[in-house]
From Swiss-Prot:
GO terms for biological process: translation. Component of the small ribosomal subunit. Mature ribosomes consist of a small (40S) and a large (60S) subunit. The 40S subunit contains about 33 different proteins and 1 molecule of RNA (18S). The 60S subunit contains about 49 different proteins and 3 molecules of RNA (25S, 5.8S and 5S). This is Small ribosomal subunit protein eS1A. One of its GO terms (cellular component) is cytosolic small ribosomal subunit. Its main location: cytoplasm. It comes from Scheffersomyces stipitis (strain ATCC 58785 / CBS 6054 / NBRC 10063 / NRRL Y-11545). The keyword Cell membrane does not apply. It holds the Pfam family Ribosomal_S3Ae. The gene is RPS1A. GO terms for molecular function: structural constituent of ribosome. SMART domains: Ribosomal_S3Ae. Keywords: Acetylation, Cytoplasm, Ribonucleoprotein, Ribosomal protein. The modification N-acetylalanine is found at A2.
Length: 256
């Protein structure tokens, strides 16, 4: 049997292990700040390779999209079924100033809404806000039993569904086009548009579980640093945002 070289045997210094360098020593951490529309502005942290030579770290950070659960931004589990996308638009020191970039429902929430014996109504519109953001807004609703109804099912006729869908599109077009993106975010959090749709369609067919399930930013205007700083309260250092007005007043009961 021919005897060959044993490649597993180390040959002097060649067998020594190379020095392992931790890649995180060449990276910097940055704090992600949400707009003041939300209660909790500290979203989290992200990292990137440190600036070297002609390569600036800020260029790699701008445009990053982060997805956060709305419950974390509002500090309430009542909003846990919605996720918000934020886009990094500006770097200030170690703070990343973000802007609203989209909203979506979680898949488990959508599945929990679909039930038998009812009709699903969906509508979507492409609309421009007052500050020239082009958005595509998706809404969904479900039919519900009418007052004193005996029949188990709540299926609606096609003609009724078309009327409801047209009304939903009109309301979304009107509500979104009249406000800025920041004002629209304040409407989306307490679901003002969904309640308006539910109220306006009562004469056509009663609805339930009316939601704006998704918002996509298709086009954004030219970047305005002043508007972004105003959205963040002139500086990215504040940790708390302003409280969103839900449009309802607390009812005070008289003592008996």
């Amino acid at each position: 049997m021919a005897v060959g070289k044993n490649k597993r045997l180390s040959k002097g210094k060649k067998g020594l292990k190379k020095k392992i360098i931790d890649p995180f020593t060449r990276k910097d951490w940055f704090d992600i700040k949400a707009p003041s529309t939300f209660e909790n502005r500290n979203v989290g942290k992200t990292l990137i390779n440190r600036s070297t030579g002609m390569k600036n770290a800020a260029d790699g950070l701008k445009g990053r999209i982060v997805e956060v659960n709305l419950a974390d931004l509002q500090g309430s589990e009542d909003h846990s079924y919605r996720n918000v996308k934020l886009r990094v638009d500006e770097v200030q020191g170690k703070n990343l100033l973000t802007n609203f970039h989209g909203l979506s429902f979680t898949s488990d929430k959508l599945r929990s809404l679909v039930r038998k014996w009812q009709s699903l109504v969906e509508a979507n519109v492409t609309v421009k806000t007052a500050d020239d953001y082009v958005l595509r807004v998706f809404a969904l609703a479900f039919t519900k039993r009418q007052a004193n109804q005996v029949k188990k099912t709540t299926y609606a006729q096609s003609s009724k569904l078309r009327e409801v869908r047209k009304k939903m599109s009109e309301i979304m077009q009107r509500e979104v086009s009249a406000v800025t993106l920041a004002q629209l975010t304040s409407k989306l959090i307490p679901e003002v548009i969904g309640r308006e749709i539910e109220k306006s369609t009562q004469t056509i067919f009663p609805l339930q579980n009316v939601h704006i399930r998704k918002v996509k930013v298709l086009k954004q205007p030219k970047f305005d640093l002043g508007a972004l700083l105003a959205l963040h309260g002139e500086s990215g250092g504040e940790e708390k945002g302003r409280k969103v007005n839900t449009g309802f007043k607390d009812v005070v009961l008289e003592s008996v």
